[in-house]
Amino acid sequence: MSTFQLSASSKDSYLFRTEEELEEEVYGKTGFFKHIRVARNEWPRVLYLSLLFGVITMVHTIMGNLREMVLMGRQDPMSMFFIKSIFLPPCSLLFIWAIQLGLSLFTPSKMFDITLILFSGCYILFGLVVWPLKGYIQKDFYWSRDIFGDGKMESLRIHFLYPVFLVFNEWTSSFLFLCSEMWGALVVSYFFNIFANEVSTRRQSQRYISVYNISNAISIFLSAVLTLVFNKWRDGVAFETKELGFRILILVLGSTVIGILALKKYMEREILPAPVFLIREVEKTSTERRKLKLDEARQTLSRSKLLIAISLNVLLYGVTSTLVEATFKSGIAAGARYTNNSKETFANFYNGLEQIIIAISLLVVINTPYSALVKKGGWKYLASLPIVIAMFSLFSVFLIAFYNVGADSGGNVLFGSLFKNRMPTFILENTLGLVTNASMKIGKYLGADVSKEAISMQIDPLYRAKYKAVYDGLCGKLGKSLGSIICTVMTGLWDITDIRRVSSVSGILIVIIIAMWYFILKYLSRQFQAAVEANTYIELDEF
């Protein structure tokens, strides 16, 4: 990298300054929006990056609502966790292998382009061909329902396989679910962060978080409104019209992915090349030394305590959020049945409310000193936010589910029907589950993701992308898959289809996870602070 030379005819010296001078001004801002630490000449790139992130998030959120609506209507809440436990891990491993191979041949930006093209093709193919022909390319709607109907399989203790059969019976909706999950892992969690980090310094990345969160909140809010409007519209039209509206929305989202690619290419050509401050010269000898490290990156990954700890941090969040979500979603299905509502309508309604809570919470937090917490030594507090919410879930999700299954259904597998003949409180269960599930996602956006990106920016950039492919691209989904495997195993052991009946076991697992999580974050906090104080890249801490 060479030093940028100022033109003699440059009329606005404000555009060309060192990063230290730029930060001195943005951290001296006052007024209502003082916590948005962006300089005037940074706004074009920040706004375009935020727009890119916002559209990516909107596709992810709307597609997530659609896939869940279809799955709740045509399958079972536990079906989605079977997909996560059986199909998601090999798909994640395949994509990580492809990314690692691709990064040895192409730049991260080019791999981002290829991924967007593939997803756009999948969504358009699904809307034009797969979904309209589902009646011809998959088994009859009643195939699994006839096999397991009237308790035929309960005497054989294999009734728990009912959600599994539905996954294969309704494989088109399973395919949509899998595509949506991989979009979240690859595009939202991995490629956008890699792209944004490639065009930003470490300190810029930390300052831009607040603007990204505004974009994220607006996108989630708009997605929630669209979901609720779509839900209301579906309730008043015929089945064929519902199907047509669903297909059109899928095709619009597939076309939007093409628009994301076009926006990214425009940014790379017109917006990002413009410098925002004087670039310092980097010594050639340092670059050569770091290239040697890049050749050893793969071997170092398996020997590094730091990278294992980051991976475990991501895994534990995935397991915890999955156990909470599984119990909450089963409660939604039970609540819909108890109140005589359609599961699709009920699920869409609660999804919309959840996203409105998330969006409003993010917008409120934006105008606080939150974005400066990492810079002021608050990494451990941000990283610990999901742990606090996990502790709250012990009471708000698992305890109330423990009560309701005892009052309304077969009781808890360990303690039986302790509350038999009592009135179930599904409104309370669904409401507390909604708040907790939304809080877990808020904790991810404001805590887990921010702290993870902060520690990622302390890793040497020449092999940061390959490491992030492991703990972002792989462990993010493997954590959810591991949580789903746990759910599937528990339903199999006790031959049940309602995961709420093992809420006592899930609660015990959450307590164990919280204890492990605490010590991992304590170690990561110590390593991060040492690197920040020394103003160096973080030590990989090999065994």
UniProtKB/Swiss-Prot annotation:
Stretch forming the signal peptide: none
Subcellular location, record wording: Mitosome membrane
Gene Ontology molecular function: ATP binding; ATP:ADP antiporter activity
InterPro entries: ADP_ATP_car_bac_type
Keyword vocabulary terms for this entry: ATP-binding, Membrane, Mitosome, Nucleotide-binding, Transmembrane, Transmembrane helix, Transport
Topology of the protein relative to the lipid bilayer: Multi-pass membrane protein
Top-level taxon of origin: Eukaryota
Transmembrane segments: 46-66, 86-106, 111-131, 175-195, 209-229, 243-263, 306-326, 346-366, 382-402, 504-524
Gene Ontology CC: one annotated term: mitosome
UniProt similarity note: Belongs to the ADP/ATP translocase tlc family.
PANTHER family: ADP,ATP CARRIER PROTEIN 1 (PTHR31187:SF1), PTHR31187
Biological role: ATP transporter involved in the uptake of ATP from the parasite cell cytoplasm into the mitosome matrix. Equilibrates nucleotide pools across a concentration gradient between both sides of the mitosome membrane.
Protein name in UniProt: ADP,ATP carrier protein 3
Taxonomic source organism: Encephalitozoon cuniculi (strain GB-M1) (Microsporidian parasite)
